[in-house]
A protein has these predicted regions:
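Short phosphate-binding loop-to-helix
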Residues: 65-87
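Short Gly/Thr/Asp-enriched flexible loops that form oxyanion-binding sites at enzyme active sites
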Residues: 103-113
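Conserved small/polar residues in nucleotide/adenosyl-binding loops
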Residues: 133-139
Length: 139
């Protein structure tokens, strides 16, 4: 199973992420816009940074970057999930997508469920919460 970690700009369970990353659980790590700061804070350089970078305020350097315009039909998290799938991920752990603004949390949960319906196993990890969406037809 190819597992990616996506890190967004919301509350971030850095201890859990660092433990999983240190154990080699992820084949790749993607920073989603402001999630780049969260990763920098724990000393992790992502394999890819993706987004319009309105939350971060600058385009990161020193890593592969996919920049999108602020006016778009998909959220940065949706673009990151799509990119993970395009690169071969069949499982994704999402950090920094729960907590914070309720509208963003609900939108992310709907987004994760949508990707699970299309074959991706998705787990969202918050500071105090966890949501797991399994691939349709699996377990």
């Amino acid at each position: 199973m190819t597992t990616y970690a996506l890190v967004g700009a919301s509350e971030f369970n850095s201890e859990q992420f660092s433990a999983r990353n240190g154990a080699g659980a992820f084949d790749a790590v993607i920073a989603v816009d402001g999630g780049f700061t969260s990763l920098a804070d724990v000393g992790c350089a992502p394999d890819l940074a993706i987004g319009d970078f309105d939350s971060l305020g600058y385009v990161p350097e020193g890593v592969e970057v996919l920049v999108f315009p602020p006016e778009k039909d998909a959220s940065d998290m949706e673009l990151a999930l799509g990119e993970a799938v395009a690169r071969g991920a069949d499982a994704v752990e999402v950090y920094g997508a729960l907590g914070g603004r309720l509208d963003h949390t609900l939108a992310n949960l709907q987004l994760l469920a949508s990707f699970a319906e299309h074959g991706l196993t998705v787990t969202a990890m918050g500071e105090r919460e966890r949501s797991e969406e399994r691939r349709v037809g699996k377990e």
